[in-house]
Swiss-Prot record:
Annotated GO biological process: regulation of translation; translation
Oligomer and partners: Part of the 50S ribosomal subunit.
Role played: Binds directly to 23S rRNA. The L1 stalk is quite mobile in the ribosome, and is involved in E site tRNA release.
Alphabetized GO MF terms: rRNA binding; structural constituent of ribosome; tRNA binding
Signal peptide: none
Source species of the chain: Desulfatibacillum aliphaticivorans
Bilayer-crossing regions: none
InterPro entries, per the entry: Ribosom_uL1_bac-type, Ribosomal_uL1, Ribosomal_uL1-like, Ribosomal_uL1/biogenesis, Ribosomal_uL1_3-a/b-sand, Ribosomal_uL1_CS
Statement: the UniProt record of this protein carries the keyword NAD: no
Gene encoding the protein: rplA
Family statement: Belongs to the universal ribosomal protein uL1 family.
Protein name as annotated: Large ribosomal subunit protein uL1
CDD domains linked to this entry: Ribosomal_L1
Highest taxon of the lineage: Bacteria
Amino acid sequence: MGKPGKKFLESKKKVNRDLKYGVLEALQTAIESSYAKFDETVDVAVRLGVDPRHADQMVRGTCVLPHGTGKDVRVLVFAKGEKEAEAKEAGADFVGNDDLVEKIQGGWLDFDKAIATPDMMGTVGKMGRILGPRGLMPNAKTGTVTFDVAKAVQELKAGKIDFRVERAGILHAPMGKVSFGAEKLLDNISAFFETVQRLKPSAAKGTYMKSIAVSTTMGPGVKIDPTLVKDIVK
């Protein structure tokens, strides 16, 4: 691993590593410390007081960010008949069934999210080794296996994210772009925190949100005081 670049070291000086910021202040600081020439993504990392090795402490869910992620999400839908037409009308980028399966098996993967109607999962499930490792497999738990394809497409286009706690007990999720500004990012991160809080497992003991940090794609981490999250969560 190479040495940190000059711009990164300069951006680190704008962050007090010994301080845990309020949520809005942390977002403002992360924005101020961004330096890339492109519109960086603002990410949040939350260390939870859970042990995801135990099924009753798994935290997994979805959240529609009020202002979206700032990314143009390419949505693919596996469907037949009238559900194909419904998906196209809702704004899906790619819609089909066996033709799409054949295309994907041939190596094509130019989409970001996939939805499937339940009757298509017998076919789609056979592509688990292709779609699974890339996080593209439709899943009922995240609302992407459904007959209500219009709603699913609209939510993904509007900025619906899905997240899952990692083995170390950490959640990572994108909250939007630096260009959003701190206030819009605050709306997004508030919605995310509300969802995470609602998903707290009954088996989780002690402090739930143990540590939180936000960062831009290229910038340093900015710590948030977890005790202040309650001030923005409804």
